[in-house]
């Protein structure tokens, strides 16, 4: 019901922490991309069968990290994966995820530190974002 409300309010996509087949149906009927959180190969396969093009691995660090992504991509190279949780805006971390085969990553508190927000330090956030994008451009395979 929440996804339908946000779609009615103009959402262009829906991202969730888990896979919900009912949300997949709502999004498919309205031609809205749905990126569910998946923690296993079975969840990814089921999400793909219901029309999800991009699957979010969440929490990526707890599910197996970059090696989990690499192991999924070997038998399922068509799988588009977004890693979230345990993703940091550093070259070591981002290069590991992109070398493993992620399509994209999601970052929250590591990219937008509470201290920077509380201190209105928008320049440090801008710098973190800029640095992260430069690293991603270096390693992302198009």
Residue ranges and their predicted role:
Residues 27-31, 98, 114-142:
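C-terminal helical cap(s) of enzyme catalytic domains, especially alpha/beta-barrels
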């Amino acid at each position: 019901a929440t996804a339908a409300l946000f779609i009615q309010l103009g959402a262009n996509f829906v991202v969730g922490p888990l896979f919900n087949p009912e949300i997949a149906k709502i999004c498919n009927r309205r031609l809205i991309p749905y990126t569910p959180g998946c923690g296993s190969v079975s969840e990814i396969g089921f999400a793909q069968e219901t029309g999800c093009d991009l699957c979010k691995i969440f929490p990526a660090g707890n599910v197996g990290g970059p090696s989990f992504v690499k192991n999924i991509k070997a038998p399922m190279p068509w799988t588009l994966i977004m890693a979230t949780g345990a993703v940091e805006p550093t070259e070591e971390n981002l290069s590991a995820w992109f070398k493993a085969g992620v399509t994209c990553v999601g970052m929250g508190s590591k990219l937008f530190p509470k201290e920077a927000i509380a201190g209105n330090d928008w320049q440090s956030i801008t710098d973190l974002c800029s640095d992260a994008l430069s690293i991603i451009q270096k390693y992302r395979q198009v």
